[in-house]
Curated annotation (Swiss-Prot):
InterPro entries named in the record: Ribosome_recyc_fac (IPR002661), Ribosome_recyc_fac_dom (IPR023584), RRF_sf (IPR036191)
HAMAP family for the chain: RRF
Organism encoding this protein: Haemophilus ducreyi (strain 35000HP / ATCC 700724)
GO terms for biological process, alphabetical: cytoplasmic translational termination
Organism placement in taxonomy: Bacteria, Pseudomonadati, Pseudomonadota, Gammaproteobacteria, Pasteurellales
Family affiliation: Belongs to the RRF family.
Name of this protein: Ribosome-recycling factor
An MF annotation (GO) of this entry: ribosomal large subunit binding
GO cellular-component term (any): cytosol
Role this protein plays: Responsible for the release of ribosomes from messenger RNA at the termination of protein biosynthesis. May increase the efficiency of translation by recycling ribosomes from one round of translation to another.
Places the protein is found: Cytoplasm
Length: 185
């Protein structure tokens, strides 16, 4: 029973960590990354469609993304979607390819992005701690129902705490890497 709780806890904490990585990867650095445009929706036959389904996005160089649209009739819609996104990008089309130059980040913008990253990291840690609380509640319920002894409860809570500490450390590592990426010119 305790092993099931630990396994579930680990899976849920891993999901929280992956969600954090996903959120943070969308925060723009000075470097061109295709994942930057992942959140963009394009108007396609009357419905919002993810950009990835109508175009191929590649990093042309360190500061330019190339968007190769599959259907030429969508070029203007894709350009408009990129332009109206809150990323502050200015695309230009050349045939079936749309080039998206990334402007250099100002020092002030970098600081703002670091604040956002730290906030995301704190949310990730809160999610992990909530998973720990749920696991500890389940363990306490087992003790209350006399399915485990107090020693087993204490041991299980210590193990859950070790798992939690490991994931909080991983969150800190992800945050440090992103901050370093944001500060690198």
């Amino acid at each position: 029973m305790i092993n099931e709780i630990k396994k579930d806890t680990q899976q849920r904490m891993e999901k929280s960590l992956e969600a954090l990585k996903s959120h943070i990867s969308k925060i723009r650095t000075g470097r061109a990354q295709p994942s930057l445009l992942d959140g963009i929706q394009v108007e396609y036959y009357g419905s919002a469609t993810p950009l990835r389904q109508v175009a191929n996005v590649v990093a042309e160089d360190a500061r330019t993304l190339a968007v190769n649209v599959f259907d030429r009739s969508l070029i203007s819609a894709v350009e408009k979607a990129i332009l109206t996104s809150d990323l502050g990008l200015n695309p230009s089309s050349a045939g079936a390819t749309i080039r998206v130059p990334l402007p250099a980040l100002t020092e002030e913008r970098r600081r703002d992005l670091i604040k956002i990253v730290k906030n995301e990291g704190e949310q990730g840690k809160i999610a992990i701690r909530n998973v720990r609380r749920d696991a500890n509640d389940q363990i306490k319920a087992l003790l209350k129902d006399k399915e485990i002894s107090e020693d087993e409860e204490r041991k299980a809570q210590d193990e859950i705490q070790k798992i939690t500490d490991g994931y909080v450390k991983k969150v800190d590592e992800v945050l440090m890497a992103k901050e370093k990426e944001l500060l690198d010119f």
